[in-house]
Amino acid sequence: MVKRNHKFQSGEGAQYLTRKAAMRKLQLSMQDFRRLCILKGIYPREPKHRAIAQRGSTDIKILYHKKDITFLLHEPIVWTLRDRKIFNRRIAAAKGKGNNLLKNVRMANYPEIKLDHIIKERFPTFVDAIKELDDCMTLLFLFSTFPAMKTVTRDITSMARRLSIEFMHYCIASKALRKVFVSIKGYYFQAEIKGELVTWIVPHYYPYQPQRKEYVDFKIMKSFADFFTVMAGFVNFRLYNSINLVYPPQFSVSLDSEESRSNEDTFISERIAALNSDLLRSDQMGTEEEDDQIDLDLLDGDKDSEQVRKLREDAVSLNKLKNLFKGLKFFINREVPREPLVFILRCFGGRASWDRNLFVGATFDESDETITHQIVDRPSLPKQYISRDYVQPQWIFDCVNQRKLLPVNKYLIGAVLPPHLSPFNRDDAIYVPPEEAALRDGVELDAGARNGEERISDDEDEDAEQRQQVQLDYALVKAFREEKTEALNSGALEEAPEEEDDDEEAPEEDEQTKQKNEKKKKMAVVSGKIFKENPSEQKKLTKQEEALRARMVKSRHKKLYRKMLEKQKKQTKEANLLKEKRQQIDKKQRVEQTQKRKTQRKEILAK
């Protein structure tokens, strides 16, 4: 008898399960199922044909791949979650009976979830874990600012606080920071760790405001925090050992004191004070700077290669960036956010301090004469020292992004600051702000100004070459004119002898005249004509080329090609909108300036 093929028993109909079916198969509640999927990295799938995958149902449901659910069935944590469900029921029963002794015993025996094997499973190599540090550090820095709540306990916040401080200390010791940026969301930092770029966000410190459950589900965030704390512990241990630092690090101040847990100001002060202290090394081996110097010496061998030359220039620029603030001492006023500035200054070799009467961890006083810069964010100061520069905080961020110490005249107290440009913009961006373009041009001009003598000598050589070229052109024109006049004169003088010559010499003279005429034609100067392109025809040709290019794309790549075209159109549209908006702003500013000038003139004439 032939086996009958039933509907939805093969193909997409048999490959997907709904969330309800998956929970029934795993015998877990909704909360435990979400927690398990977060820990294992399992996410819902989007099928190609939803109607077939949902077995004819028209409702939009959350679907999971059948292989993913089978993969979760073999996870040992599933048994722990089932045991927890039983323990929760028993603890609730003991609490209802009023038997506190039995309740405490069951709470002490509450099963714990171990995530070590999941970390090894999801990140087989250390580089894989580094690639996932972006979300990890962003979430840990966010949780470190939370107070103790019902869902987010004090243990989680203190652990996030400790791990984030350890990671910042590694960036300081290895000088791994590369880019910084300030926005309304917080402080953006980018570090280079083991050849991988890690970007994370540190939020601004504002008083905590409770959020509604519809907006933020702290239970889901807690599941991510549990996973990322274990992951960050492994990563920090490996990073500290790679640069010969003792782990766990010993800080001069306690990060888990009772006062810091109850008082937010004390917590922030102790956290920043920990950043301003050096860590203990496991041995006195050479630092990474010596290794970089050895690599630079090896690159000196092949100076003809353009790639090697570029690598050497990048290495030299990176070494300068690592020691950007070396030898400089900064005093931070109390109105300035200290943690991001202390972190940046310490990463690039600078020394920072603040008022020791207000915050702990200060290393020198404001009256120290060796202070080179004082960071101020107020319109004026009653007392100022001549031996130091008073700058606004943006100067620190712009210096790091430009990889050089910028002039302080644009960042003085009360000055209108230049635009704070993002260093994360790509070079192939369609729209480039005018300020960024001017800044790029200014960098080139400054580079030329630093090499003043070379630029002057190059200009002199160019002027000499131009003079020689002009003289050569003048000599050629003069020779052409002389040759032309000689040809005309010789033609007028040869008319008389031609009548007296015999008929035998006539062919030779004809050949000579033909050659002269050909020379004249070759030496003739013809005025050029400007070719005007028709924009409509040019647009038509480009459309035809695009259509031809689209026909040449293979059928399996046409969907990807359409997505690429849609993305390009979207980027072009956004760039055009930004350009129009910029033109409107510039026009408005020009009108305001003209109106201001008119009012000033009227006031002067009225006087």
From Swiss-Prot:
Pfam families: BRCT_2 (PF16589), Pescadillo_N (PF06732)
Signal peptide: none
Biased composition (Basic residues): 551-562
Any GO MF annotation of the entry: RNA binding
Presence of the UniProt keyword Zinc in the record: no
Matching PROSITE patterns: BRCT
Its biological purpose: Required for maturation of ribosomal RNAs and formation of the large ribosomal subunit.
Protein name: Pescadillo homolog
Record organism: Culex quinquefasciatus (Southern house mosquito)
High-level lineage: Eukaryota, Metazoa, Ecdysozoa, Arthropoda, Hexapoda
